[in-house]
Amino acid sequence: MSDLNNAMRVYEKIIKNVLRHHDELLRQTYEQMIDVRKKIDEITRQSIEIASYPKIDLSIESNRGGEHRDLFDAYLKYQKLIRTQKEELINEMHVLTIQAEGIHRIYLCFQILPRVEYRIINRIYVKGELYKTVEEDFGLSHRIFEQKRQQAIQIIQNVYKSDLSNEQIVYLCKGNSIIQKERDV
C-alpha cells in the first residue's frame, strides 16, 4: 500500500506542477519540438548532400594503396552516424509529443471538475493563491475543504488514467458546464 500512496503523491505533484505552469510547460515543449525539427531538417540536408557525392569505385587501384577503401569506410560510418542521429531525434520528438499530450490531458481533466472543486483547485494551483486564504474564503471547515481539494485531485487522476479519449473528456467538460448553469438558475 505504501507504493500506491507514493505513486499517488507523485501524480499529485505532477498535476500541481502542470496546473501551476501549464502555459509555460506547453511553450517550452513546443520550443523543444521546433529545435528538434530543425535538427532533423539539418541532418536530412546533410544526408542528401552526402548521397549526392560521386560513388566510390573500389575496383580502381590507387597509387596510395587503401585510399579508396578508407574513404568508403569513412563515408559508410558517417551515413550510419546520420541515420542514428535522425532516429534519436525522431524518438526525442515522440517523447516531446507524449509530454505535450500529457500536459493537455491533465488540463482537460481539471476542466471537468465540479464547480466547487474546480474553484478550489483553480485558486490554489492555477492562480497560486495561498491555501489558507482560499480555505477562509470558502467558509468550509479545514477537514471539508481538504476533502474537496483531495477529491478534485483524485478526479483528475482517475479521468487522466481512464480510457476516455480527450474528445470524450471535452464532452464531459461541456456537459458539466451545462449542468452547472442549470444549477445556478
Ranges and model annotations:
Residues 1-108, 162-185:
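N-terminal interaction/assembly modules
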Residues 145-163:
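DNA major-groove recognition helices of helix-turn-helix
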Residues 127-144:
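Helix-turn-helix DNA-binding module
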Residues 120-121:
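A short pre-motif secondary-structure segment
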Residues 105-112, 134:
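Short, mixed-charge amphipathic alpha-helical segments
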